[in-house]
Amino acid sequence: MEQTYQYAWIIPFLPLPVPMLIGLGLLLFPTATKSLRRMWAFQSVLLLSIVMIFSLNLSIQQINSSSVYQYVWSWIINNDFSLEFGYLIDPLTSIMSILITTVGIMVLIYSDNYMSHDHGYLRFFAYMSFFSTSMLGLVTSSNLIQIYIFWELVGMCSYLLIGFWFTRPVAAKACQKAFVTNRVGDFGLLLGILGFYWITGSFEFRDLFQIFNNLISNNEVNSVFVTLCAVLLFAGAIAKSAQFPLHVWLPDAMEGPTPISALIHAATMVAAGIFLVARLMPLFIVIPHIMNFISFIGIITVFFGATLALAQKDIKRGLAYSTMSQLGYMMLALGMGSYRSALFHLITHAYSKALLFLGSGSVIHSMETLVGYCPKKSQNMVLMGGLKKHVPITKNSFLLGTLSLCGIPPLACFWSKDEILNDSWLYSPIFAIIAWSTAGFTAFYMCRIYLLTFEGHLNVHFQNYSGKRNTPLYLISLWGKEGSKISNKNLNFCLVTLLKMNKNGRPSFFSNKVYKMDENGRNLIQPFLSIPNFSNTKTSLYPYESDNTMLFPILILILFTLFVGFLGIPFNQDVDILSKWLTPSINLLHQSSNNSIDWYEFCKDAVFSVSIACFGIYIAFFLYKPVYSSFQNLDLINSVVKMGPKRIFSDKIKNAIYDWSYNRGYIDAFYGTFFTAGVRKLAEFTHFFDRRIIDGIPNGVGFMSFFVAEVIKSVGGGRISSYLFFYFSYVSIFLLIYYFLNL
């Protein structure tokens, strides 16, 4: 066992040769490297698979022996300071390593087909492999300096992948937004690291925790300064894990390729913030104020992310806000001190969310045959619907991921989310009410995404549903706005007018007109990007199922979604593998070793949580299930529903909720108005002050010197009369001064 731990340092470096060799090959032998691009993809998967096997071996040994291993190399600079580098293998490291490698392998296999049409295929795999290396280095770090180095590398890789299609202005802006937002958190993280080094004199986790606990117990530190340093450390996690108020970069990050969205949301960048807080829990646990602050930020993010997901038309952005809300649950659990449930939910959510993102990528991939390589169209749920007939495997996998995230047993997220919800009652009834109500919101918006995507009819064609009359009652979204229209002399079809807008621009359920799309209109829909040699060979008016290379990872993730939750079933300690796995960490956090519960208590809590989820699903089905397609005469329904005061009031509430959700809670607008515009005005004022004041003073002195010199030069023109005039003038002035001084 000791020998296995000694070679654990190789874990972060195994995937590293792939990006290095790809870069070297593209520099020296570009043609040969591009012709062998599938070989590089295979090597990426192979090396990451070796890391996964290594991580599994370490995890099995830790489950059996509950051991922690650390090895460091000391770089002595002088007698007062030493910088150490090494690696730490503990339950948290092994959990994160398995999570990164398993999800990473699935994403790499999936990407081979998904990115096959793209000229940046090799660049994508180089970034992905380096991303895995950076994240593995982060989770195996033994001190705060290494954490910060790999933290920045993880951020760099995410920026490169978010802006992968950098020729698209939207993707470039999304990359810049992610960079600037994370700069705020990373600067706070750096200040926090330096602050705790100033307090304890060490970067190593073990020494840091031990020294700090001794200082706290002896009351030898300033509590205000310690809390400030802890908040600065936590600021890094807020930005990385998209917690309020530094969450604004996450939905825009969907401009990157879908596979990287799956990796970022499941096992890498957003998980890094949760990992950092979990790693520093022994530090935070002795600072009560910071624990309360962590839980407060978590509960705000839980509710905020869920409400912002209600009105999204983009399938990936809806899933992004879902990730934000679920990360809030994890942060809430960590703030409550529920270490086990937070990591449990991190595991279950990772596989469920990876399944959902890869499923959405399969949907987008199939929609591109109809609307082309245009994210605004291929990711728009308003144009989808009825896909269950065309992509049945993707539909079933997406449904399983949806039900898991909704908290339906026995799927993975049910077990972990239920633990967090139950623990919230013990911590704060107010937090518990918000957390439980948000569980209903989660079920609602996830079911909404599923229904808009797979149920009903294929709305990109938008034919009448009954076959006899145009039926405008089946309107896609209570929350959706009218999109852009296609204008053409021969095209009398509005591509996304699925909700008829009234005079004030609000969505209306009842309209008098429905526009149909003829064959000429369908033929006009072409890809906005035509890539030679990589164009789709299949052309169809309907979507089709993805290739086996994309379906295989989805099927594997289905197995994880079905069975990974059983790792932490709390009925019996003998089968509770997760508790055995986390035994050292649980003891460190002063948690009880008895994690088993009785059947009655579990069933009582489970029935309540499942009932809330079912209520959210029911509301979603009531609003979005295409039950109206069977009605042939809509005048009957229009005559029943009348515009009364109650209807007007309910419409105002719906519109207010829609505006809040669709406009991202106005946080982006607030930042744009006060921060972005404020910084620009400050820059303009600084520019004015620099040019007119700072530069104006020396320029003015120079100008005055030039003017005086010109005057003196004109005086010394060589005329004797001028010299005599100035001579007598100066003598007269001096005599007058002398006279007045002697009065």
From Swiss-Prot:
The chain crosses the membrane at residues 9-29, 40-60, 89-109, 125-145, 147-167, 185-205, 224-244, 258-278, 284-304, 327-347, 354-374, 396-416, 425-445, 551-571, 607-627, 723-743. It catalyses: a plastoquinone + NADH + (n+1) H(+)(in) = a plastoquinol + NAD(+) + n H(+)(out); a plastoquinone + NADPH + (n+1) H(+)(in) = a plastoquinol + NADP(+) + n H(+)(out). This is NAD(P)H-quinone oxidoreductase subunit 5, chloroplastic. PANTHER family: NADH-UBIQUINONE OXIDOREDUCTASE CHAIN 5 (PTHR42829:SF2). It comes from Helianthus annuus (Common sunflower). Keywords: Chloroplast, Membrane, NAD, NADP, Plastid, Plastoquinone, Quinone, Thylakoid, Translocase, Transmembrane, Transmembrane helix, Transport. NDH shuttles electrons from NAD(P)H:plastoquinone, via FMN and iron-sulfur (Fe-S) centers, to quinones in the photosynthetic chain and possibly in a chloroplast respiratory chain. The immediate electron acceptor for the enzyme in this species is believed to be plastoquinone. Couples the redox reaction to proton translocation, and thus conserves the redox energy in a proton gradient. It holds the Pfam family Proton_antipo_M. Belongs to the complex I subunit 5 family. One of its GO terms (cellular component) is chloroplast thylakoid membrane. NDH is composed of at least 16 different subunits, 5 of which are encoded in the nucleus. Its EC number is 7.1.1.-. GO terms for biological process: ATP synthesis coupled electron transport. The gene is ndhF. Gene3D superfamilies: 1.20.5.2700. It is found in: Plastid, Chloroplast thylakoid membrane. One of its GO terms (molecular function) is NADH dehydrogenase (ubiquinone) activity.
